[in-house]
């Protein structure tokens, strides 16, 4: 790394420093600023015409009934994160990045989702999860309960429970699954099965005694009791399933990973005993997961860490499965059901990376989730599978500074501040732990490894943890009825659309009247007509 001492007022030094900044920004790309072909108007006109033709084909809507539903949820994946992840994906494959397409970019329908909670302008992941899973907006910090419930007040739970699309799918005879890179009892997945007035009640060990005595149940317990026989459960959170002080199978000597349950229950053992007459398997590492034969397993419980799974950049590739690997196994198990499936997939550690001000971690998590989206697309069909990709909320993350084409996404802007005469990175946070002042002056980032894995990007306001952002987030959709995600929507609209596409929940009857068939079906028209007639007569 180059280190340059900048002397205020010294024009020669300043000029030299700008040259060094430019070299740092462009180092390793080995490419012109942009491809020669982009200088020719024909390139852009041809591309636009190609895109136009693709858009015109969308007039022929896919109105099939969705046999399968997949929701990919990028926790904290605001639009700036999507854009930066796109550039990173391209740069990882040797491109300049901006022209790259994420898998989600290829989805034909895009909408915006308004993320506020009923009591919060800037949302948290619990209230938002209740919206996009249960179909109703809710208060921050609560999961699976309406806005009539008050956070941490146990006595406001009963009577205010709301059910999720995962439950609607299960009741319709579909297989259902949850895959996450966080704890399986974290905010996002918990709204799929739990009714809890506090997202932090992971086990009874985190609950106040009065709440336990009043009959409120911890989230881990609800995972196994509220919706019996969830077909696929994969993620972290192992310690919340075991008795307090029981050592962990992977980290037996580390007390911070010991069990947390005060009631002495071993929820994994209980699950194993309950499922012993079914084709069920418990796994806790990558080797065990990848040795699973989906044809011989109908139910799987995979708990790969005591807490959250490691960041993708830091995971042990020999022992820790990637999100893509978990998703592939999940779909291969779930798709055996002739009635189809519902799968919730969370790229949960995008959010954690941003909270820590570690943009590199966050963006690599987003790229990995996009990889999982691509894998899911390869093993499902657009004709019978509705796939939606969205975020629960955004973050105080952005990038700018007039960076040139192909600038490494983690690099410096091509200029100095005209206030303190110091360089700055393209990526910055509005608030967070990256605020650092040395001798009353902003830290000189050129003296740091600003492209390091755990570098904390500079922020405008000092906070121990960076906060969420309040702007709308994107919704990408493909498959049956994806066109119903088409404008600016309240976040709670999402599960209603997905349920309508699959004829489940409140919308289970509409297929009986409409037939739910489309000319987009790959089946013969006569077969489609026969299926429609069967639905009308039966």
Region roles according to the model:
Residues 1-10:
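N-terminal secretory signal peptides that target proteins for export/translocation
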Residues 11-30, 524-537:
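Cleavable N-terminal signal peptides of Sec/SRP-targeted secreted and luminal proteins
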Residues 15, 19-57:
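Extreme N-terminal flexible tails
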Residues 35-52, 61-67, 77-83, 87-130, ...:
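A post-motif C-terminal structural segment
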Residues 71-74:
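Hydrophobic residues in beta-strands of the RecA-like P-loop NTPase core, especially within AAA+ ATPase
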Residues 144-159:
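His/Cys-centered metal/cofactor-coordination and adjacent catalytic loops
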Residues 161, 166, 171-191, 506-510:
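Glycine-rich phosphate/pyrophosphate-binding loops
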Residues 509-525:
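C-terminal GPI-anchoring signal of eukaryotic secretory precursors
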């Amino acid at each position: 790394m180059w280190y340059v001492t900048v002397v205020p007022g010294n024009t020669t030094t300043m000029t030299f420093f700008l040259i060094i900044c430019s070299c740092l920004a462009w180092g390793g790309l080995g490419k012109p600023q942009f491809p020669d072909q982009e200088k020719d108007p024909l390139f852009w006109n041809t591309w636009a015409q190609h895109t136009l033709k693709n858009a015109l084909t969308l007039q022929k809507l896919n109105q099939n009934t969705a046999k399968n539903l997949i929701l990919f949820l990028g926790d904290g994946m605001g639009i700036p994160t999507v854009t930066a992840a796109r550039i990173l994906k391209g740069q990882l494959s040797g491109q300049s990045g901006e022209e790259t397409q994420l898998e989600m970019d290829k989805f034909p329908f895009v909408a915006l989702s308004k993320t506020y909670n009923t009591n919060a302008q800037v949302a948290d992941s619990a209230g938002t999860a209740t919206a996009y899973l249960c179909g109703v907006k809710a208060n921050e910090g609560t999961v699976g309960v309406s806005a009539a419930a008050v956070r941490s007040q146990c006595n406001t739970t009963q009577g205010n429970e709301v059910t999720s699309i995962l439950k609607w799918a299960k009741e319709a005879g579909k297989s259902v699954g949850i895959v996450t890179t966080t704890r399986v009892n974290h905010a996002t997945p918990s709204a799929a099965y739990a009714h809890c007035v506090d997202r932090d009640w992971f086990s009874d060990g985190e609950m106040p005694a009065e709440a336990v005595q009043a009959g409120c149940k911890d989230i881990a317990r609800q995972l196994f009791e509220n919706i019996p026989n969830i077909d696929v459960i994969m993620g972290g959170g192992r310690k919340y399933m075991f008795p307090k002080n029981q050592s962990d199978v992977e980290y037996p000597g580390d007390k911070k990973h010991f069990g947390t349950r005060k009631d002495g229950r071993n929820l994994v053992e209980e699950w194993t005993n309950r499922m012993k007459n079914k084709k069920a398997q418990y796994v806790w590492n990558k080797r065990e997961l990848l040795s699973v034969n989906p044809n011989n397993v109908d139910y799987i419980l995979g708990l790969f860490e005591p807490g959250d799974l490691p960041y993708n950049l830091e995971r042990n590739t020999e022992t820790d499965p990637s999100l893509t690997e978990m998703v592939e196994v999940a779909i291969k198990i779930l798709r055996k059901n002739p009635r189809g499936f519902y799968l919730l997939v969370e790229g949960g550690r995008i959010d954690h990376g941003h909270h820590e001000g570690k943009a590199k971690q966050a963006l690599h998590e987003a790229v990995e989730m996009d990889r999982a989206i691509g894998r899911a697309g390869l093993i499902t069909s657009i004709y019978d599978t509705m796939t939606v990709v969205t975020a629960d909320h955004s973050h105080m993350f952005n990038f700018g500074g007039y960076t040139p084409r192909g600038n490494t996404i983690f690099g410096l802007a091509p200029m100095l501040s005209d206030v303190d005469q110091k360089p700055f990175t393209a990526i910055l946070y509005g608030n967070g732990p990256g605020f650092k002042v040395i001798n009353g002056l902003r830290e000189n980032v050129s003296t740091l490894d600003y492209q390091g894995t755990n570098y904390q990007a500079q922020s405008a306001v000092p906070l121990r943890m960076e906060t969420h952002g309040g702007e709308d987030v994107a919704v990408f959709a493909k498959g049956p009825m994806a066109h119903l995600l088409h404008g600016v929507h309240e976040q709670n609209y999402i599960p209603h659309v997905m349920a309508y596409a699959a004829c489940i929940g409140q919308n289970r009857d509409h297929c009986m009247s409409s037939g739910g068939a489309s000319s987009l079906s790959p089946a013969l028209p006569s077969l489609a007509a026969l299926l429609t007639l069967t639905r009308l007569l039966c």
